[in-house]
């Protein structure tokens, strides 16, 4: 498969491009500016670029797909040519969905805590030798395989692209979802609080029938949104667990007694409770979870 990335300099985009390259796909890409670390990575991976800038000659009818970055402008010459040729143009989340549509998609959403929770989940799974695919906002944040059953996706609420302003997390159709928090910020992509909350309502309703959502019941907006949803899914609330503090150390109350943790913030303890629900749905039992969590920093 030949895939061209318009906006390869975006973190999500080059992570996805590298993951596809590792699978043996033919990858090319362009952007106005690449940071120095990315230039080094692209040289090491032999990703096809012509330097910085846009090159409409890269767009031809031999391409199987064009992936469009979230920050690419509507008059981009490569995008214009791809549209003229009638090529298949995908946003990042659309293309990621196509790559993972036969897997069990675990989507972690929320305004501020999704990345931390996704990191916890991936740490727990790796500690317990549970191999999964993933797509998160971090260096080397995308891994795709043919054999893994699960994929963990960090679901952002930013627009998918200039030609499709649907929020990214509407595209994934999760089997298993987590919603951590809803915090509206003035001056963002969404016009007002009501519109912002509506995007999360659509996300909850996009969970496949019979799927599940794990949600933070201590966030009033999240709680009301999830509990009022008529989508026929299972709903698992979580909250800050019971814990003790002694000599600067946090001890979590567990069925097997107090367990020392490396984390200490109440927010992280609450995030841990959500991660536990997700990991249990992915085959990690309570004992395995707590053993791994004791090593998370």
Predicted features along the sequence, with ranges:
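Short beta-strand "acidic-cap" motif of Rossmann-like dinucleotide-binding folds
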Residues: 26-31, 133-135, 237
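Adenine nucleotide phosphate-binding catalytic loops in nucleotide-utilizing enzymes
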Residues: 2, 6, 43, 69, ...
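Short, surface-exposed amphipathic charged segments that create phosphate/polyanion-binding patches used
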Residues: 63-68, 104-109, 146-149, 243-256
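Active-site core of PLP-dependent enzymes with the aminotransferase class I/II
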Residues: 8, 220-221
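Phosphate-binding loop of NTP-binding sites
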Residues: 19, 23, 57-58, 70, ...
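Short, solvent-exposed loop/turn elements at beta->coil junctions and helix N-caps
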Residues: 54, 139, 240-242
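N-terminal leader/targeting and accessory segments in enzymes
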Residues: 1-91, 95, 260, 264-266, ...
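Short alpha-helical patches at coil-to-helix transitions and adjacent helical residues
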Residues: 10-13, 118, 269-272
